[in-house]
């Protein structure tokens, strides 16, 4: 059975409060066993994800979490910006703009801040390979004082 299809019912809640005490992040990261959840490498992954969220400010975990209404609004904005272009060109531009939107707003699609050669998704996949269990980011929340 592929790791990606296996259930993740264990895990930890990670937290990070920025040194200025004005930004805090909570994240739930799940894995298949308590054994992996207690592993230092897994804990490091969770810590790195909280730092990623603090620095890069994603709004959603994965592409599937982005509301269809938000995607439709983004597409309309881009279509309006490029309405004088031929339809085939608009489609290509739209595709690129939506990829940029995902990279800016979706945690798993973002460039990993500790290694800009890979995405957060690729970083997690590398840890799945090392730890031998499926790992899923379930949810996160970022708090900013005054926001």
Language-model region placement:
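N-terminal assembly/interaction segments in proteins that build large macromolecular machines
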Residues: 1-147
């Amino acid at each position: 059975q592929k790791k990606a299809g296996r259930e993740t019912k264990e895990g930890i809640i990670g937290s990070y409060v920025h040194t200025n005490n004005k930004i805090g992040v909570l994240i739930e990261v799940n894995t298949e066993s308590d054994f992996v959840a207690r592993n230092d490498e897994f804990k490091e992954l969770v810590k790195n994800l909280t730092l990623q969220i603090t620095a890069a400010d994603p709004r959603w975990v994965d592409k599937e979490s982005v509301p269809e209404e938000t995607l439709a609004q983004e597409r309309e904005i881009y279509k309006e910006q490029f309405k004088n272009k031929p339809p085939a060109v608009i489609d290509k531009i739209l595709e690129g703009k939506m990829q940029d939107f995902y990279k800016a707003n979706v945690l798993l699609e973002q460039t990993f801040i500790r290694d800009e050669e890979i995405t957060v998704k690729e970083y997690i996949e590398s840890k799945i390979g090392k730890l031998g269990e499926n790992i899923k980011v379930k949810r996160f929340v970022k708090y900013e004082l005054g926001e």
